Amino acid sequence: MIRILLTILLLIHLTSCKDLFQYSPNEVRLEEEEKNLNQKNIARLQAIPVQDQIKFVVIGDSQRFYDELEDFVNNINLQSGISFVLLNGDITDFGLNKEFKWINRILKKLTVPYFAVIGNHDMLANGRLLYNQMFGAENFSFTYGGYKFIGLNTNSQETGYDGSIPDLPWLQQELNGNFKQAFIFSHVPPFSDQFDKNKIHDYTSLLKTNNVGMSIHGHQHDYSYSFPYADGVPYLVVASMNKRSYAVVSVNNEFTQVEEHHF
């Protein structure tokens, strides 16, 4: 009887501690509510009435900066008028299952929808598979208030610059639609050496000729806003989360405004 009781107590203890055990750091194991988050949040966003001015927040490179990310969420939840938050890649540091889960546990506390694009660190280990399961397609888009928002994988180095990333034919197809203006989100900017140099000209040409309002990136870990190709297209790079900084982009029919905020 004592042996049976001890066995039951041990099973209860192990069940309560299941989150502490992993069979492998490279495992892929997500709960159903942790899957396909970008599409779920697109559906949430579409249910929110469009205001005269669309205001969205961009952050980058959350990686291992969990405390700073918690503070960011608390800061955003105190504000009004924000439509959504975009995490611009390097969600994780090592592409591990637990890292994806930890970041989502923090960001799901936001009172507005959030979206994430894939970064180069997210393609380490089984990270690419985990990203696909947790967030969905690496290239995705949605329309809100007549504006088009496009998420694009630009992590060319992770596939050996084999010509597959970024997928410019897909991007061209997305830019063929009818919209007021498009905003492109990706992790690696075209002026980084980790962007396929054979695709820089075609990428920048697509933006210049297809009513793109801004190309928005992370990866560099420092904030910048510039016109590097002197073609009228602005390039925004957001700082890494440890810099305790984010960008607020406000858009209406007359202008687009960008501000860096600190918390």
Predicted feature residues:
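Core catalytic region of metal-dependent phosphoesterases/phosphodiesterases
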Residues: 69-139, 143-144
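N-terminal active-site segment of His-dependent metallophosphoesterases
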Residues: 17-102
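Binuclear metal-dependent phosphoesterase catalytic core
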Residues: 20-37, 59, 142, 224-263
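Beta-strand-turn-beta hairpins that frame and shape the catalytic cleft
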Residues: 47-56, 141-151, 177-181, 227-234, ...
